[in-house]
């Protein structure tokens, strides 16, 4: 995305947030106030876009692109237990005799 395109996008969002009409003149005014040089056709293109499409519709449909994440991992091939199978009880690790005595070279 070019700097000009990004500046026009931000200008359109600012205008929408302030409740002002999104026109090429208003976009140019904001870009000039920000000190960004924009090619003359960008503000006109954005003004035409927002004349046809609502900014609210574009904002709410942002997540439409890209693939969805899988709901769950696929089970491994072979004899993997089913998801509904009872989980095995974890055995408690008993400390060895050396750990109980507290003898260590690095204590």
Swiss-Prot record:
InterPro entries: P1/P2_N_sf, Ribosomal_P1/P2. Residues 67-107 are annotated as: Disordered. Coiled coil: none annotated. One of its GO terms (molecular function) is structural constituent of ribosome. One of its GO terms (cellular component) is ribonucleoprotein complex. Keywords: Ribonucleoprotein, Ribosomal protein. Gene3D superfamilies: 1.10.10.1410. It comes from the Eukaryota. Residues 69-86 have a biased composition (Low complexity). GO terms for biological process: translational elongation. It holds the Pfam family Ribosomal_60s. Plays an important role in the elongation step of protein synthesis. P1 and P2 exist as dimers at the large ribosomal subunit. Belongs to the eukaryotic ribosomal protein P1/P2 family. This is Large ribosomal subunit protein P1.
């Amino acid at each position: 995305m070019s700097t000009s395109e990004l500046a026009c996008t931000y200008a359109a969002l600012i205008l929408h947030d302030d409740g002002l009409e999104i026109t090429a003149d208003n976009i140019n005014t904001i870009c000039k106030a920000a000190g960004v040089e924009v090619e003359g056709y960008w503000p006109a293109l954005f003004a035409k876009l927002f004349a046809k499409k609502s900014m609210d519709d574009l904002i709410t449909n942002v997540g439409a692109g890209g693939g969805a994440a899988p709901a769950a991992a696929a089970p491994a091939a072979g004899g993997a237990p089913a998801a509904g199978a009872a989980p095995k009880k974890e055995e408690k690790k008993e400390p060895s005799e050396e750990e109980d005595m507290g003898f260590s070279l690095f204590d």
